[in-house]
Design a protein with these regions (language model features):
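Redox cofactor-anchoring modules in respiratory/redox and cofactor-processing assemblies
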Residues: 1-179, 191
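Charged/polar low-complexity intrinsically disordered segments, enriched in acidic residues
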Residues: 183-193
């Protein structure tokens, strides 16, 4: 069909999730649907199993702290050090529980992955996996602390849309004007979730 060799993301290219074309459906929470070739780096990164992501981080993370330095939540003054979570998870180091618990502060924006990490690792996926695992086990970080003072370097580390577009490799998909096309669509079957 029209989607052969393509993959669909529900949401944006950084925080969106892959759509299971066989089982997912459009609901009132469906966001924009983005269609990319299956070979696109965004799709490859989202499809990479967490086990492989952790192995790559274990082998290639140089502990440069760029993921933490570029983290918008860190720059706003929250005590989140993404590099510590990545190192702890990828090396199974449980010496400091705060390295894991601070992942609760991660909003999953992906700046650490797309802009921060020069090793092309995926700190976002690791942080979100740790955050999800802790939640499933009922472990919650106390998030009743207000952020500390906004870091002075924040202004110089803001990321423009243009830089994100280039780093994501989607410049060719960005258009100043999008022509609307209306087509009649008559599906063979319709499933209604109850």
């Amino acid at each position: 069909g029209d989607l052969d060799g393509k993959a669909v993301i529900n949401g944006g290219p950084m925080m969106g999730r892959l759509v299971d074309l066989e089982n997912d459906s459009v609901t009132k929470t469906t966001k924009g649907l983005l269609i990319f070739p299956e070979t696109h780096s965004i799709i490859q990164r989202k499809r990479m199993p967490i086990s492989m992501t952790l192995k790559r981080a274990s082998a290639a993370c140089c502990n440069c702290t760029m993921c933490s330095d570029m983290c918008p939540r860190n720059l706003l003054g929250y005590n989140i050090n993404v590099h510590k979570t990545v190192r702890a998870a990828s090396h199974s180091e449980v010496t400091d529980s705060e390295s894991f618990l601070q992942s609760a502060l991660c909003c999953g924006c992906g700046v650490c992955t797309v802009i921060g990490c020069q090793q092309m690792l995926d700190p976002q996926k690791i942080s979100m996996d740790v955050k999800g695992a802790l939640g499933r086990k009922g472990l919650r970080r106390q998030n009743n602390q207000a952020p500390q003072q906004v870091r002075p370097e924040r202004a110089s580390r803001l990321v423009s849309s243009s830089v994100l577009i280039d780093r994501l490799g989607i410049r060719k998909y960005v258009k100043a004007h999008v022509e609307r096309k209306y087509i009649d669509f008559a599906p063979n079957e319709v499933y209604i979730e109850l």
